[in-house]
């Protein structure tokens, strides 16, 4: 499954109204750790087709980042059945992220 690039308008239908697990990466193009995390997110998306994986650019979707209290990037939020379940701030290795899904 490919990584979804979400806008505020898509977030509710793609993440909040879906059953199952979703991994949402809040990032910015200029962020070094975000760039390091990008291939890890792609790998997780390929390895875990049962998980909805999405990216949200905080520079373009500041309202959504603010709504979820994203203060540092990268921030990964894991949703289960539309509810926030876990939060990871900063770069993490793939195995650490997978263990939280």
Name each model feature, range by range.
Residues 2, 7, 27, 54:
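Conserved Rossmann-like nucleotide-binding pocket used by diverse enzymes
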Residues 3-21, 62:
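A short beta-strand-turn-helix
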Residues 11, 24, 41, 57, ...:
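Residue-level signature of catalytic and energy-coupling elements of molecular machines
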Residues 19-21, 38-56, 60-62:
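Conserved helix-turn-beta segment immediately C-terminal to the redox Cys motif
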Residues 22, 62, 68-77, 95:
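Structural micro-motif
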Residues 26-39:
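Conserved redox-active cysteine motifs that mediate thiol-disulfide chemistry
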Residues 77-101:
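Non-catalytic, surface beta->alpha helical segment in thiol-disulfide oxidoreductase systems
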């Amino acid at each position: 499954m490919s990584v979804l690039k979400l806008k505020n308008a898509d977030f509710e239908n793609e993440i909040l109204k879906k059953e199952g697990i979703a991994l949402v990466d809040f990032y910015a193009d200029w962020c070094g750790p975000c760039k390091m995390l990008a291939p890890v997110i792609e790998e997780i998306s390929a390895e875990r087709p049962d998980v909805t994986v999405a990216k949200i650019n905080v520079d373009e979707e500041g309202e959504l980042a603010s709504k979820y209290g994203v203060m540092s990037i990268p921030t990964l939020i894991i949703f289960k059945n539309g509810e926030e379940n876990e939060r990871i701030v900063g770069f993490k290795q793939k195995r650490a992220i997978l263990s939280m899904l």
